[in-house]
Amino acid sequence: MPKIVFFNHYHRGDLLTHKEFIRQVQTELPNYTYEYMHFNHPKLTRDLNIPLIGEPTNLDPKTPFYQEDGVLYINTWIGCFWDIFCQHGGINMNSLWHQWEKIFVQINDHFEVDLNLKEQKEFYLPSIDFNKFDVSKIDSYLKENTNKKVLICNGPPKSGQSFADNMQDFINPLAEEYPDVHFICTTKFPTEQKNVLFTDNVIGDTEVADKRAPWEDKEVNICDLQEISYLSENCNAVVGKNSGPFVFCETKTNYMNPNMKFLSYNVSWGEAFHTGEKKPTETMSNSLEYKCEYTIVPISDINTLTADDIANINQSLDTLVRSL
């Protein structure tokens, strides 16, 4: 039986953004064997129904394809297609689409088939099969709390997409001003506000895996990104830094929900950076047609927020909450 092994050496969001491309391959080539190799929690690719066979330790992270004994190994990391990454301004659906255009050519040549990408890039916005995960505690929280909810992905980005600060100095005053709104944060910080909640408490994930990724400084034992995604689809707004949990909230359901509001703090990158413009291009929303309200606030200095950055963050958060 023909066989394809997908592999990826990098972060969790890198595994999410390729799901619909992989699902198309699975659908159009149903009589193939599929396997996956990555360093992350096995939950991250569970809903693809592809066996996780280990880690790609012996494979080069910058090599896009391997062929061995008739098996095609496909690297799903966008960074191994550096020309595409740079041409389209970093990670966004344009760069992913053109990456998979090359992957489809390789699959077609290797197996003598005729896969074609769909022209509508919105088709490839990721979806998660939440039936594969325990979301019962989230459902209980949602049933007991019908007030407005803002999910804030306030942890540090893994790849320099935005500032690392946990935003407590922005969130605590905001929560005090709007006591009827729940602000659910993905990273804990000291607070006396009863309406500041944390995903650790709302989700209560207990599924532990003994994993250590080479780029982590601690064991990756718990992964609640799918559950955070589920929670996001039941919130009124999502705030984040274009990394980690925020990426898992950028689902097709949320993008096509006209009542959903996104607020993203991004650095400038790619062509916009080099021409002196401040419009960030490294965002999944770039050039897509979506129904949600998506606001990007550029961050000028991710190491030390400037006075303008601080003012823009405060103003954008207040504007967002007032609009709910």
Question: What annotation goes with each model-predicted range?
Answer:
Residues 2-98, 227-231, 244-255:
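Active-site and donor-binding regions of nucleotide-sugar-utilizing enzymes
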Residues 16-19, 163, 168-273:
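Donor-binding and catalytic core of enzymes assembling or modifying cell-surface/extracellular glycoconjugates
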Residues 84-165:
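Mid-sequence helix-capping/hinge segment at a functional interface
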